[in-house]
Amino acid sequence: MDIEARLEYIIFENKANHYVVAGFSELKTYHNFTAAGRIEDPIEDQEYVLQGEYVKHPKYGEQFRVDMAKKKLPDNSDAIIHFLCGENFPTIGKKTAESIYETLGENCLEKIHNNPELLHEVPNLTAKKILIIQKGIQEFTGFNETYAKLLKYGLSPRQIQMLLDTYDNVLDVIEEDCFKPYYEVYGFGYKTACKMASAIGLSNEDPRRLDAYIYELARQLSMATGNTYITFATIFQNVRGVNESLIQESIDRLVSLQYLYVENTRIYPFTLHEDEVTIAKGLKNHLFEVESVDVESKIKQVEFSLAITYDQEQKDAIQLFFDRSFMILTGGPGTGKTTTVKGILEICKDVYPDSKIQLCAPTGRASKRLAQLSNCDSRTIHSLLQWNLEDNSFGKNEEDPLDVDFIIVDEFSMVDTHLFAQLLKALPQRCRILLIGDEDQLESVGPGKVLEDLIKSDVIDTVHLKKIFRQSSGSGIVTLAKEIREETTCHYEDGVEFIERTTPKIMDALIDYVKDMDLDSMQILAPMYKGAAGIDEINRQMQVLFNPKSPQKNQMKVGTTIFRENDKVMLLKNLPDEDVYNGDIGTIVEIDSKQNVISVDFTNTIVDFSTDFLYYLKHAWCISVHKSQGNEYQTVFCIVDVNAKNMLEKRLLYTAISRAKKQLFIIGNKSLFETQVRLKLKRIRQTSLQERINEVTEKIF
């Protein structure tokens, strides 16, 4: 869509990347609107031709998204002649301007802009003056030849902007290596780079194509397996039909460019190698002697004020926190981790009244839960580090560290290698650290097994809480979790019920049990998305059961999914500007079909999702076990489907059942469940973190 409009006022301008938000008035209709996008050197009262479309921003409402903007050229004779005699066109006088108009006629400037060769038709116009006119029109309109060329390469305006923000001489960079943006620009993917390479005419035999393929393979395998490195053998097995010597040459080139890193037989994506090194060095900086504080009397005061009694294991953990600069606290459900942390916080405020204590967790829901349980402020790690969604950078780092004396990180088993490296970079050197987690839960989605590697390095004091305290309703849940951890016989009692069903009967049993449940306190967990008992089908059936079609409720189809007012949904992307994050669950409160907007209430934070953002939502009556991590629910339904046998590993089942607080219903194949919880892990993540820690760090005590 093209709109001719006058720029009335500038709301915001980023001079570094030319991103502008401004108020415009359409020339034909006088319609006032807000536009946002790349506009070079915006001028108030200037007329522009804007190319783009109207969108609904999730926070700022309707606005025109500018894909391309250029100043509108004069279109009547007097204005054209006056324009060509102006400062943009040195040495072009009135007679030359009149000659151009007489030769090319009305809209001659637009004609020249679209086809500069027309200037050769003007009598007595020298080559030098032709160049002056071409350059002057381009500079005035803001039309960028680089931008135009990148459009021809099949790039979207957003992708072009990413390149322009990164490189001063984009075309030179691409001419040298059209895959360079793929390696260096966050969000510029492999498929986009391949498409651009084909548009440029890069030969299929060009070695740069093989380089990019091998790098993509290394990156994808790391994400799929959770490994921080892969082996040469794995590369050779996956790159078929290519001579091994050519593969080796490609790896050597990628290493020389610092896109890959090689140690013996291990090949790392360069950033993951850097992250492991950063963590090892960071730990060394945070392991230092502290002045010990005897807190025995303080513990008694906390026991009195909180009306609790700590066992010796918990008391030792609290004392250790005040004796060490770095500590890990682990334990299964019901072992008193939260109660122990409450005591640590109370005593810390008393002993160090001027100290700054920061609580955080990897997900929004885990952070909110930590805040509720501790009565202290807590933030997500991404929010704390001022994560930038656009370029995946962090505002807090070694150059601008956090102002904290103590940091406590909950649900640490979910933290991957890259995120922990960024957190350590942002901590001041004398900051003391407490990491809390359950080492038997699922590992992080991203590469690494950080909690396990830290514990096994044996350089950080670790307290394993073992005694179970939760003996009220639902005590059978923590008992079952303990039985799975210790690989003893499973019992299903005191809040735990196993409903044995074959896969075709799982759905009927689930519907029969959940139909009278309180939706706010119940969550269904399943291991996979597809199939008769998969997440997608369960959500379809739950929508029919809990939120059927009604004339009183608006609905909207997004792809193959129908969203309806009152639906339970989950956010699939981090939106730091809205303070909502991947995994947050909310309720659809309004659907505006005309504007293509879905409004979701995430616990008193309402976010509007427009066309470009609708795919960030997914139904959430049933979610994956990974997405549930960091959360607790009063009642959990855990699906054990034989079709998901390969996914039903011990860690996943343990994580699923430990999400329940009062009631746990396991539906499916009992024999499969009891077999899988005793199987040793089939896939052990490959990392070098433990080795690196032991190489550079010695235990202080």
Where are the model-predicted features located?
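Loop/turn positions that initiate beta-strands
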Residues: 45-49, 566, 583
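Short, charged beta-turn/beta-strand-edge "cap" motif at the junction between a beta-strand
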Residues: 53-58, 572-578, 641-644
